[in-house]
UniProtKB/Swiss-Prot annotation:
One Pfam family in the UniProt entry: Toxin_cobra-type
Keywords per UniProt: Acetylcholine receptor inhibiting toxin, Disulfide bond, Ion channel impairing toxin, Neurotoxin, Postsynaptic neurotoxin, Secreted, Signal, Toxin
Cellular component, GO annotation: extracellular region
Location(s), subcellular: Secreted
Gene Ontology MF terms: acetylcholine receptor inhibitor activity; ion channel regulator activity; toxin activity
The protein, known as: Long neurotoxin 2
Tissues in which the UniProt entry reports expression: Expressed by the venom gland.
Disulfide bonds: C24-C42, C35-C63, C48-C52, C67-C79, C80-C85
Function: Binds with high affinity to muscular (alpha-1/CHRNA1) and neuronal (alpha-7/CHRNA7) nicotinic acetylcholine receptor (nAChR) and inhibits acetylcholine from binding to the receptor, thereby impairing neuromuscular and neuronal transmission.
Gene3D superfamilies (alphabetical): CD59 (2.10.60.10)
InterPro entries the record matches: Snake_3FTx, Snake_toxin-like_sf, Snake_toxin_con_site, Toxin_cobra-type
Residue ranges that the Swiss-Prot or TrEMBL entry lists as coiled coil: none
C-alpha cells in the first residue's frame, strides 16, 4: 500500500512539472503571457530608430528558446529565465 501511494505521489509530481511553461512579458501590450512550449527564456530587446532622440529607445519583450543575438550594431538584448523577469525598462 505504501509503495502504491509513493508511486502515485511521484507520478503526480512528474506530471505537474511537465506541464509548466515560462511566463514572460510580451509586447506590444506589455502583458504577462505563457510562453509556447520549448521557449523558456524571456528577453528584452532595445534599439534606437529615427525617433530615438524624442521618444527614447524602442522596446521589444518576448519569449525565446535561446537568447536572441543582435543582428545589427546598436541593438541591446538582455535575457533571463525566471517568470516575468523581462520587465519594461525604466529610463532616467
Amino acid at each position: 500500500m505504501k509503495t502504491l501511494l509513493l508511486t502515485l505521489v511521484v507520478v503526480t509530481i512528474v506530471c505537474l512539472d511537465l506541464g509548466y511553461t515560462r511566463r514572460c512579458f510580451i509586447t506590444p501590450d506589455v502583458r504577462s503571457e505563457r510562453c509556447p512550449p520549448g521557449q523558456e527564456v524571456c528577453y528584452t530587446k532595445t534599439w534606437c530608430d529615427g525617433f530615438c532622440s524624442s521618444r527614447g529607445k524602442r522596446v521589444d519583450l518576448g519569449c525565446a528558446a535561446t537568447c536572441p543575438t543582435p543582428k545589427k550594431k546598436g541593438i541591446d538584448i538582455i535575457c533571463c529565465s525566471k517568470d516575468n523577469c523581462n520587465t519594461f525598462p525604466k529610463w532616467p
